[in-house]
């Protein structure tokens, strides 16, 4: 009887862990529910600082962006929703540059070659950190619901998490969050 219960429990765990995952051309991704959250100024968690290396070999440190709004997108070349949202993020990065908003990517689980091909194919011109070990994802998951790919975090000028989109972003969801955060300067 105990072994039957163990098998049922293991099956339920597999279903729970795979629920929300998507399948695209045989490549999996960790799907979110496309929810968005905006945090009031007094209720924002401090974003964890990180240091990493960009896909082109340049050092990147989040703290060096203090004083600017930062959009940090967690993505992978293997992720179909990441491919779908990439062109929108590229457009937004150009549109909000004059408003002092910087965009960064956190490439999770890719080789540098695959990640560079992704950014080239999608037209992403902003830097991305190679996070093959998922260490930045793990640090952010301690303070926000970062555990799905894609997830996009908006960090205010003081380094606090002002907004979060779990799953694929839309142009409207991001402009709403960015207009709110940039207006509160």
Predicted stretch roles:
Residues 1-47, 185:
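N-terminal targeting signals for export/organelle localization
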Residues 41-44, 49-70:
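A short beta-strand-turn-helix
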Residues 66, 74-91:
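Conserved redox-active cysteine motifs that mediate thiol-disulfide chemistry
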Residues 71-72, 103:
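Hydrophobic beta-strand anchors of alpha/beta hydrolase catalytic cores
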Residues 74-76, 106-109, 131-132, 166-168:
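Active-site-proximal beta-strand/loop segments in catalytic clefts of secreted hydrolases
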Residues 83-122, 132-139:
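Structural microenvironment flanking redox-active thiols in thiol-disulfide oxidoreductases
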Residues 117-125, 131-185:
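Thiol/disulfide oxidoreductase modules built on the thioredoxin-like
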């Amino acid at each position: 009887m105990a072994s039957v219960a163990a098998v049922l429990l293991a099956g339920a765990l597999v279903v729970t862990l795979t629920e929300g995952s998507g399948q695209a051309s045989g490549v999996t991704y960790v799907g979110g529910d496309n929810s968005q959250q905006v945090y009031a100024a007094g209720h924002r968690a401090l974003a964890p600082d990180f240091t990493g290396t960009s896909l082109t070999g340049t050092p990147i440190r989040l703290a060096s962006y203090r004083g600017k709004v930062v959009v940090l997108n967690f993505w992978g070349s293997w992720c179909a929703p990441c491919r779908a949202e990439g062109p929108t993020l590229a457009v937004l990065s150009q549109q909000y540059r004059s408003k002092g908003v910087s965009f960064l990517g956190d490439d999770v689980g890719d080789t540098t070659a695959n990640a560079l091909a992704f950014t080239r194919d999608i037209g992403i011109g902003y830097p991305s950190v190679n996070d093959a070990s998922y260490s930045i994802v793990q640090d952010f998951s301690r303070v926000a619901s970062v555990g799905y790919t894609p997830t996009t975090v908006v960090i205010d000028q003081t380094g606090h998490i002002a907004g979060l989109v779990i799953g694929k972003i839309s142009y409207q969801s991001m402009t709403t969050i960015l207009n709110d955060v940039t207006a509160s300067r």
